[in-house]
């Protein structure tokens, strides 16, 4: 039996294949809680407008809370005609409280109803993802605090560039995820615009005070000012999908670093067994699958953004059924990212760092810039100093020695002012300590930033 919210003008039942194509309850059932929250607020607005009496209002609220409880405890039983979450809730509500349920949809369209549901849902997932990102930042911060003095190669073009500290590397990703959190919080401000009361597209003619709805739904702090835009706007979904995709890109970059650093060729870190897998053929293998999946799943997050934007790009005002396609990309991105962030935080918290392998990867050529800086201190223009050091690097390569072991005569042949003091430059810890500008890799600056982030993440957000 069908329980459609429409159909009076139709003389034929919906074809079975059309129902399968059209119905969305199988995926939009996760909107049950926010749908019921919106319906309770709507019932309050109906009561205030005198469209239902106190007894009907009480029955609606009681029945809706019973339906909410059924969804929460897993006892809700779908019916064959449950086209979507709105139909399912109203059908079950009528079974529980009788014909009073028939008044709930007075003056309301599924267009403004689902727009409200989606805004409530996206607010909730944005906050959830913000919490997950904080957990990841804390895992990175703990590693940074342990390794403020741990030296490692820093890379550009995946080539050894200059020495840095592993703590500084961890802090870089904390900053990256901080921007993601800022974007989430900023997006929430645009989600908190209430479309309820806009009707199908033109507004409400039954005396509903929309201002009252913002009091009943305290997640919203302003009303949508144009009913046409209110029911057709899905910018907020596109925005959070983009933010999810960008978080995924940042996770992918983090994962790529860890995959490299965990390889035998680097050996800088080792992932815990709990976040690695093996090979069905090669007994010796320990694969960084947690990181590879983070890297791989970033692609589906990007795909979900494109999916929604493609749906929206050609839609005329106002609501169109195409908009039903906003939900699965959103739900998929949230599910993927919510679990991925948990895995990332746990994998980082439990990984083992090998400072000795990091130190062994350092080489004197990484201090070539320090040598150029020394020439600058002697009054030589940097571009000239750069060229002289390039000559010294080439000469060391020709002789098959490191810069540290290049004879003084070779140094003086390129720059006569150099003396034996030049060899003091070849001290990795000294080099790193000199990078003491704000935001630099010097251990004192890394410790300073660790304290800053500890205050932000633990004390300010406790």
Swiss-Prot record:
GO biological process: arginine biosynthetic process via ornithine; L-arginine biosynthetic process
Protein name: Argininosuccinate lyase
Pathway(s) where this gene product acts: Amino-acid biosynthesis; L-arginine biosynthesis; L-arginine from L-ornithine and carbamoyl phosphate: step 3/3
Predominant location: cytoplasm
Enzyme class: lyase
Kinase listed as a keyword: no
Catalysis: reaction(s): 2-(N(omega)-L-arginino)succinate = fumarate + L-arginine
Subcellular compartments: Cytoplasm
InterPro entries cross-referenced by the UniProt entry: Arg_succ_lyase_C, Argininosuccinate_lyase, Fumarase/histidase_N, Fumarate_lyase_CS, Fumarate_lyase_fam, Fumarate_lyase_N, L-Aspartase-like
Single GO molecular function: argininosuccinate lyase activity
Name of a matching Pfam family: ASL_C2
Keyword annotations of the record: Amino-acid biosynthesis, Arginine biosynthesis, Cytoplasm, Lyase
């Amino acid at each position: 039996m069908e329980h459609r919210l429409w159909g009076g003008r139709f003389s034929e039942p919906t074809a079975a294949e059309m129902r399968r194509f059209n119905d969305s309850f199988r995926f939009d059932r996760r909107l049950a809680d926010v749908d019921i929250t919106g319906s309770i607020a709507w019932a309050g607005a109906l009561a205030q407008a005198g469209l239902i009496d106190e007894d009907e209002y009480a029955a609606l609220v009681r029945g809706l809370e019973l339906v909410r409880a059924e969804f929460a405890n897993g006892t809700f039983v779908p019916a064959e005609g449950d086209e979507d979450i709105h139909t399912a809730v109203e059908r079950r509500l009528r079974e529980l409280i009788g014909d009073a349920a028939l008044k709930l949809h007075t003056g309301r369209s599924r267009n403004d109803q689902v727009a409200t549901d989606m805004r409530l849902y996206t607010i909730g997932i944005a906050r959830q993802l913000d919490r997950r990102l904080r957990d990841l930042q804390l895992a990175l911060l703990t590693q940074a605090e342990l390794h403020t003095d741990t030296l490692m190669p820093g890379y550009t073009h995946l080539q050894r560039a200059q020495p840095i500290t592993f703590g500084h590397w961890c802090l870089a990703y904390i900053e990256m995820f901080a921007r993601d959190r800022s974007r989430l919080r900023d997006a929430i401000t645009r989600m908190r615009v209430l479309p309820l009361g806009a009707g199908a597209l033109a507004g409400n003619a039954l005396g509903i005070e929309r201002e009252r709805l913002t009091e009943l739904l305290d997640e919203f702090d302003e009303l949508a000012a144009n009913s046409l835009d209110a029911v057709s706007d899905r910018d907020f979904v596109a925005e959070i999908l983009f933010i999810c995709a960008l978080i995924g890109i940042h996770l992918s970059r983090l994962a790529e670093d860890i995959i490299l650093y965990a390889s035998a060729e680097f050996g800088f870190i080792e992932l815990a067994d709990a976040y690695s897998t093996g090979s069905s053929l090669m007994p010796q293998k320990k694969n960084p699958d947690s990181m590879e999946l983070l890297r791989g799943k970033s692609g589906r997050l990007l795909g979900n953004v494109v999916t929604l934007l493609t749906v929206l790009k050609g839609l005329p005002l106002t609501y169109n059924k195409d908009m039903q396609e906003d939900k699965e990309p959103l739900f998929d991105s949230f599910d993927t990212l919510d679990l991925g962030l948990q895995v990332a935080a746990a994998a980082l918290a439990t990984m083992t760092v090998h400072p000795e392998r990091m130190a062994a990867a350092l080489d004197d050529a990484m201090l070539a810039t320090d040598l150029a800086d020394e020439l600058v201190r002697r009054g030589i223009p940097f571009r000239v100093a750069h060229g002289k050091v390039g000559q010294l690097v080439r000469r060391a390569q020709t002789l098959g020695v490191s810069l540290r072991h290049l004879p003084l005569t070779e140094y003086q042949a390129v720059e006569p002012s150099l003396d034996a003091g030049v060899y003091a430059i070849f001290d990795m810890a000294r080099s790193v300590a000199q990078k003491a500008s704000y935001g630099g890799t010097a251990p004192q600056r890394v410790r300073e930033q660790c304290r800053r982030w500890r205050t932000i993440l633990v004390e300010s957000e406790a």
